[in-house]
Amino acid sequence: MQYILKLKYYLYNITWKLVFICVMLVLLIVGIHKNIKWVCDYYSGPLSYIIVTGNRFFTTNDDINYIILKSGVLGTFITQDVNIIQKQIKQMPWIQKVSVRKQWPNTLKINLIEYIPIAYWNNEFISTTGVVFSVSECLYNEYSSFVRKMYQEIPILYGPTGKDQEVLNNYLRFSAILKSSNFQIKSVKTDTCYTWQLVLDNNVCLKLGCVNLIERLHYFIKVYPFLVKEMDEKNKYIDYVDLRYNSGCSVRWIHNMIDPVFHAINNVSKGSHDYD
């Protein structure tokens, strides 16, 4: 009799333990199901926020919105292919690098690196890394005051198609030499014969010709103080300095910015043609 009671008690305990375990398993399964459903619902929501980082000078918010709309309606965190958007943004000519990634749960993050223009090149721009790129004219109205100021300060380079690197390199060489005497270059121009011409920030034009360019720049720096003295004494302005002579240079003077007068230095006559 005592044995039967112990057996019943044992079976009773086993039954309740099994019931408890079953209940806990059911609750666990229900909880997991609800969590999975919540996660799926959370991730199935559309990407609704866009964060754009990086130093943007040319890229406007309208550009980003247009590209995203062009790529189709934004998907969810799981379904959206960021490579499509990244490829579309990279096609903008002023974009150097772009990174597009998703940030949980509903944000698209875009980081941009644009080419920084060092100068105008013909009707385009040339970057600090020597890459020629263009910018839509309609974007100019969107530029910040900083960018407008930058455009006013960068030089203008002209030259035959395909010679952008050579012109840029010479600009950098000329600029380094003139900077030591507080001159800045507004424009550099060369033609198919590779004759070079500069315009400085004081609007003085330098005609360098096609040979001995560096030597001629140094010569200009040497004689410029004498030209300044004459400008002050006679109230004249320099139109251009012709440095193409084998020795010396000639100066075209302008009185009151109207009448041209020619002046020669170092015994070089006005009509002489002994230059390159």
Swiss-Prot record:
InterPro entries: Cell_div_FtsQ/DivIB_C (IPR005548), FtsQ (IPR026579), FtsQ_C_sf (IPR045335), POTRA (IPR034746), POTRA_FtsQ_type (IPR013685). The chain crosses the membrane at residues 12-32. Keywords: Cell cycle, Cell division, Cell inner membrane, Cell membrane, Membrane, Transmembrane, Transmembrane helix. It holds the Pfam family FtsQ_DivIB_C. Residues 1-11 are cytoplasmic. It comes from the Bacteria. Residues 45-115 form the POTRA domain. Its main location: membrane. GO terms for cellular component: cell division site; plasma membrane. It is a single-pass type II membrane protein. It is found in: Cell inner membrane. Residues 33-276 are periplasmic. One of its GO terms (biological process) is cell septum assembly. Essential cell division protein. May link together the upstream cell division proteins, which are predominantly cytoplasmic, with the downstream cell division proteins, which are predominantly periplasmic. May control correct divisome assembly. PANTHER family: CELL DIVISION PROTEIN FTSQ (PTHR35851:SF1). Part of a complex composed of FtsB, FtsL and FtsQ. Belongs to the FtsQ/DivIB family. FtsQ subfamily. HAMAP family: FtsQ_subfam (MF_00911). This is Cell division protein FtsQ. It comes from Blochmanniella floridana. The gene is ftsQ.
